[in-house]
Amino acid sequence: MVVTDIQAGICGFRTTVRARSDDMQNVTLEIESTCEKISALAAKLGPIDAYQEIGAGFDGVVLTAARQVLKGCCAGCAVPSGIFKTVQVAGGVALPAPISVTIERKD
């Protein structure tokens, strides 16, 4: 199992993604979030073929569902990228490593 903890930023919402794959290709997700929009996104995601997902890139299942659910300021949410990376690791097409985005205002 792959577990990813995502802290989305200034909104303060937290998301935990648990991903399993019995065959290193087809990935089942369990997503818990304090954000109702991410919970709605999670409800749209069934099992995902990691090979198809990585090949489709921005047109894959995760990011397509994110575009449908996350509108306005939520369109910049980091959680969908975290879900996508978790699918990659669970499917064996990427290695686990921390990712981060740091935003600072330097006037």
Name each region found by the language model.
Residues M1-V27:
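Short, charged/polar N-terminal "headpieces" of proteins
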Residues D22-F84, A94-L95:
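Active-site- and interface-proximal helix/loop "cap" or "latch" segments in soluble metabolic
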